[in-house]
Amino acid sequence: MSDLVKVTLPDGSQKEAPRGTPVIDFVKGQIGPGLAKAAYFARLDGEPVDLSRAIERDARLEIVTTRSPEALEVARHDAAHVMASVVQKLYPGTQVTIGPAIEDGFYYDFARETPFTPEDLERIEKATNEAIKADLPFVRSEISMEAALALFEGMGERYKVEIVKDIAAKGAKTLTLYKHGDWVDFCLGPHGPSTGRIGVVKLLNVAGAYWRGDAKNAMLQRIYGTAFFDKKELDAHLAKLEEVKKRDHRRLGPQLGLFTFHEFAPGAPFWLPAGTVLYNVLEDAMRRLVLKNGYQEVKTPLLFNKRLWETSGHWGKYRENMFLVVDSESDPALPLEDRCSFSLKPMNCPSHHLIYRMDKRSYRELPVRYFTTDALHRNEASGSLGGLTRVRQFEQDDAHIYLREEQVTDEVLRIFELMKVVYGAFGLGFEATFSTRPEQRIGDDALWDRAEALLRKSLDATGLKWTLNAGDGAFYGPKIDMLVTDSLGRKWQTCTIQLDYAAPERFDLTFVGEDNKEHRPVVIHRAIYGSFERFVAILVEHYAGAFPAWLAPVQARVVTVSDRFEAWAREAGEALQARGWRVEVDASSDKLGAKIRNAQLAKIPFTLVVGEKEVEAKGVSPRRHGGEDLKTMPLEAFAELMTREATAPF
């Protein structure tokens, strides 16, 4: 065996180094000190490794620097380790559990009887940043599972012991440890070279979290934080978080009179008058769009016998998320025909399959596209409910398309065109993910192979860049999920396109082909908004409650300079209402400045001032939300402006 190894760099060039050379030494000696200084971790043949890892074989080497988001993710995991070590030093007896990097930050879960206070958080943050400055190296080692178990048992870390036992039960023989100073934890890594490379840490808040996400387990304390290499970047991020708080739909929704919740109906929103207008505008726009694109609207029952869900597979795979309304199967007092179970539907697809099956179908009819906005109910855990983004009762712009296999790619392209129209109207960017077969699924592997290959081909045909989300498909088929990007750069999952070969088999769905024989159709499940509730939450935060004129619950408010001008104000308001615009009149005794301010606070797109000159001109003086004053114009001219700016774009 040669004492030298060949290292292939990203540009294809090759260099030689003594076997066993640490990555960081290779970079310093063979590439240059600049890259070595910027390096945070590396990849050897695609595997993320520490910079201290020895190069033992010929390999491809990629250096990940602090300019990469991936390096920041590793640094945040480093920060979680440092924070945990500080917590155990400041609060002896605290048990550590898990502490991963997450989007935009990190957290660590602690078992401690006394709750952490805001003052504790400040103390921990200060000590964490001091520990970072100590610039202690992260040292990696591997030990046997037996030694790991003895180590953490000796430390009294019962949660770590539980995890070690689980890892051992899966067949692992060794465990990777990382140590900085005298504090040690296990994880896969990689980590940065030392604590001093992390940058600056800010702790954000403390929340409760059940051990392993199970409400039957102990309640832990989760400390959230974030880290950045540069304080300016941290400050910008904190400013963004403040803006996120201001835009929180849970705050703005009730403030703007859109929706509220009540303890008597957890997870089910009450849509207030303004919110109902917004909801209906969204629903009507989508209905117009799909009906002119070959869809047929249907409505089906909310309550179904469990036999439907047994046929669809939901009873076996999804029952814990369903609301069982009637359960009388074992009631001896009832006649046999009345002994049954009923549940509220969590999905529309099975009922649409029943409609498709009611008639004999020809290949000439396909695709058949059913659309609905029926209410759905899913039994989400109470702890997971949060505003409109996670609810128990909701509606979707739900559609199911029955078609021949060779029509799938064209149909996916049609759906993408609809999606671009919708997201473009709201100024939302988007990207795609492709989700493949999950562990819990129906249908054999051959069917899944076929479905995944076809949907991947269809996704490629759109020309969009996409990422793979392995194992996250629906239990009946692979799917494309769309992530929209809002005005704050946050990503939200909305549109889904799911390909289903299993339902036609389970429901015996057929069509008569050109050969006059029966064939199975393929089913596409698709939604563009996703749930209306979640989409409204996205829009509230995207627009900070200041909706565009076509979407706003109130599009214009007429305000009077004084009560002398009330007659024309009401006449103007009624004339605009007669044209279909959503207009209010404020002829209260408040001063004009207060009326304008109230309209601005209500985020109404246009405030129409009416005083003496407006009465004389039979017009209005519009002011846009945000303060731009338009010149006085005849009422007809403003109506034309509304036609241009307040007509639904789809």
Curated annotation (Swiss-Prot):
Family matches, as SMART domains: tRNA_SAD
Gene Ontology, cellular component aspect: cytoplasm
Protein origin, superkingdom: Bacteria
Cofactor dependence: Zn(2+)
Subcellular location: Cytoplasm
Reactions performed catalytically: tRNA(Thr) + L-threonine + ATP = L-threonyl-tRNA(Thr) + AMP + diphosphate + H(+)
InterPro entries: aa-tRNA-synt_IIb, aa-tRNA-synth_II, aa-tRNA-synth_II/BPL/LPL, Anticodon-bd, Anticodon-bd_dom_sf, Beta-grasp_dom_sf, TGS, TGS-like
Enzyme Commission numbers on file: 6.1.1.3
Residue ranges of the region described as Catalytic: 248-548
Residues annotated to bind Zn(2+): 349, 400, 525
Leading EC class: ligase
Keyword terms of this UniProt record: Aminoacyl-tRNA synthetase, ATP-binding, Cytoplasm, Ligase, Metal-binding, Nucleotide-binding, Protein biosynthesis, RNA-binding, tRNA-binding, Zinc
Gene3D superfamilies (UniProt xref): 3.10.20.30, 3.30.54.20, Anticodon-binding domain (3.40.50.800), Bira Bifunctional Protein, Domain 2 (3.30.930.10), Threonyl-trna Synthetase, Chain A, domain 2 (3.30.980.10)
One Gene Ontology biological process: threonyl-tRNA aminoacylation
Keyword tRNA-binding listed: yes
Keyword Nucleotide-binding carried by entry: yes
HAMAP family membership: Thr_tRNA_synth
Family indicated by similarity: Belongs to the class-II aminoacyl-tRNA synthetase family.
Function: Catalyzes the attachment of threonine to tRNA(Thr) in a two-step reaction: L-threonine is first activated by ATP to form Thr-AMP and then transferred to the acceptor end of tRNA(Thr). Also edits incorrectly charged L-seryl-tRNA(Thr).
Protein name, UniProt field: Threonine--tRNA ligase
Organism: Anaeromyxobacter sp. (strain K)
Name of the encoding gene: thrS
